[in-house]
Amino acid sequence: MEPSMIVVTTENVTGYRTVRMLGQCFGVVVRSRGIGGNFIASLRSIVGGEIHEYTQMLEEARRHALDRLVHNATSMGANAIVMMRFDSAEIGQTMSEIVAYGTAAVIEPAR
């Protein structure tokens, strides 16, 4: 992630004023577990409890979606993303889509 990009889930950034809203930006990742991972996960689902293979995959997918969101906002000329959210969906039976989205903005320190 770009070190100069501020990403918040709120509408405003404390201590900053919004100069310009640039519009919607997003980062999308679609992931699929391999056959081996699905097999191990299905065995674990019989016993119950956390399925670490899927947890790790989804954590990694969120990080990649956030990186893509920041890249998208940077290419728009933003130095901040406000109202950032994650969303997810299943595509078929073997794939997960993770979307990070928000509003790209230009902000500056409040006077």
Swiss-Prot record:
It holds the Pfam family YbjQ_1. Belongs to the UPF0145 family. This is UPF0145 protein BRADO6695.
